[in-house]
Structures are given as C-alpha cells and as structure tokens.
Amino acid sequence: MQGDVRLAVDQGARAIGLIDGAFEYVAPVWHKEILYGLSKGVAVFGAASMGALRAAECHAFGMIGIGEIFAAYASEIRVDDADVALLHGPKELGYIAITVPMVNVDATIAGCCTRGLISAREARHLKESARSLFFKARSWNAVVANCSEIASGRANELLRILRHNYVDQKNADAMALIDALRHADAYSPPTHFEFNRTSLWRDD
C-alpha cells in the first residue's frame, strides 16, 4: 500500500520487491516513493501485478522489471491495468483467487493453443469472451458460458482443458522476482535523475 516503499527505504532496506496491491479500496504504492528509493541507491524490483505496472512506468529511472507480464506492459503489448486484477477471498482463507485475471487467461489459452488442445478460432473467441467480462465476474465457467460461438457439446470439454492446463503467469512472475531478490546485491540502480521534493512529499 502507499507509503510501504518509503518506510522500507527509511528503515534501511537495500532491495525491495513489489508484487501486488489491493485494487479499488487501498491506495497503491506511489511512483514518487519508488523514485525516492532509487535515488537512495535501493534496488527496486517489480513483477506480476501492481509491481509489473510500476516497473513498466519507472523502468527508465532504474526500477527492475521481472517476468512476462512486465515485458508485455513495458513493450505496450498490454496497456490495460485491469488485466492483472482479480477477486480474491479474505485473509482467513489465504486470499484464495475467486476469479481469473486476464494475464492468466491469455497465458493459459496460448499454452493450450500451442499444444493443439484448442483451435485458433476457439482461442480467439475465448479471449474475446474473457475480455468482455468485468474482472470480478471472470471465472472459467463465465468465460465459456459467455462464448456463444462455442457449441454446447464442446463447452464442457473446453472447461476441462482450461482448468487442467491453467497457467498462473502472475505466480510464475512473482516467484521469478523472489529469485531475483536473492541476487539483489548484483544490482546497482543508476541515479541519473534528481529526486525533487514537492508539496506532497516532505522529509519529516
């Protein structure tokens, strides 16, 4: 949440990994605090979700992006912030995922298509169906049910294929970031910019 990165920097962190945040109800990590950390020589990594978004936005200042999702945003192949959003359960249930983020939909469908489990036509229709759904309503059941171009006799088979071959790209990228943090000492962020205080940023 907003302020966490600044607090970590002020407490002496030398490397910070940013993965996810809570959408809608909690203020996310601010770009300014990331720049603050970079200006102090702290290696700041981002991946998977909010971390990938911030890394794509702050890469030019030295933030280190990790993974496929970051690469897609950095190259502007992917532009919608909501593509990483999902609905999850409460802390008591381990924040279990209830819906499927678009980045995982795309990765899963691409994998199934590459292995010949679904056709290019089915892949296209499934992606269109998934993208038309609000992130809080995007489950595999909803994606397939919302896809009118899929014959009813094929729907159950598609659902089985998608679930059995699910690719959790967010998790894969998050694990890659954790691995990168183990070698964080090898990174030294460039400080080719001047960090400017503003009316919204004070040192006290």
Residue ranges and their predicted role:
Residues 3-81:
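Metabolite-binding pocket within alpha/beta catalytic cores that recognizes anionic/polar moieties
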Residues 64, 79-82, 100-107:
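Residues forming well-ordered secondary-structure scaffolds
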Residues 1-17, 26, 31, 87-204:
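Accessory terminal and edge-of-domain segments that mediate assembly/interaction
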